[in-house]
């Protein structure tokens, strides 16, 4: 292998592991390992992790949970073949399935639909009261995330482009620090960081409002093509536990909040308030034509992702949009709806 190729490979692997933490408690060397990438936004993913449902249902596997700060980082880890499953937003997925990334993974679950749990917040004292007043201002957001996508959509709705503002690529915790120091004037981010931003700022627009205007964003669970082909039984178990978590959010929100709180270091009451800001589907809705669809019949989520890809291309974030067929082929419908609704 040429030196340049070796360096490139090492660089990708290093990026995949940057800014993430790993939970490998209980690993045994004689078992295969399932590698799951998660993020700290409130979702059923954190309930599954905290409750150790996968460890219980898959005793012959090690379960390796790795925390990532954004969907862009999750994409990088998939490219480096460091993940089997990963939680990331619809915009990173749309980017990942489009050229030049062309990541070989499939959308296998809808974790949540962004509502008031993602928002554009202007800092108190910045003098900004409307999106139009952001012209020339510094705005922090994690690049290639759903928040970045929503920010571009919000700017576009108000006659602005990325060239009219100063975009700063920051992860959520870095956004909070820069916001509090006054280094940035506004930020588009998600929970739990978002609630901290709101203590010293005000919402200009939320992702719930953008969804009503035709620019919805989602948090999704993806599985690598290679893993899905080799271990469809594990994919079924994983989907069933995610469906179980959604049921818990609906049926026993206090228990759901307690499990999530233990993972992100907040009180159950704080998490309970945050859960009310998102939109959590039922398993039946996840497997409906509006979202994933049924076996052999990919749902409307493919249209949503293609629309996001087209928007990213229009904003010159990617070279060109992928066709609808690309996204339909990337929806994992095996066994739906029964696989997650029984």
Give the predicted meaning of each segment.
Residues 91-92, 168, 173-265:
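Pocket-lining segment of extracytoplasmic ligand-binding domains
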Residues 63, 162-165, 265-277, 319-326:
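Short, surface-exposed acidic
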Residues 1-33, 338-342:
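Short, low-complexity disordered leader/linker segments with a strong preference
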Residues 47, 67, 71, 86, ...:
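Solvent-exposed, acidic/flexible segments
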Residues 27-161, 166-169, 185:
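Short, glycine-/small- and polar/acidic-enriched structural segments
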Residues 230-314:
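Secondary-structure end/capping motifs
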Residues 57, 77, 81, 95-99, ...:
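Structured segments of extracytoplasmic/periplasmic soluble domains
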Residues 304-342:
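Conserved C-terminal helix/tail region of periplasmic/extracytoplasmic solute-binding proteins
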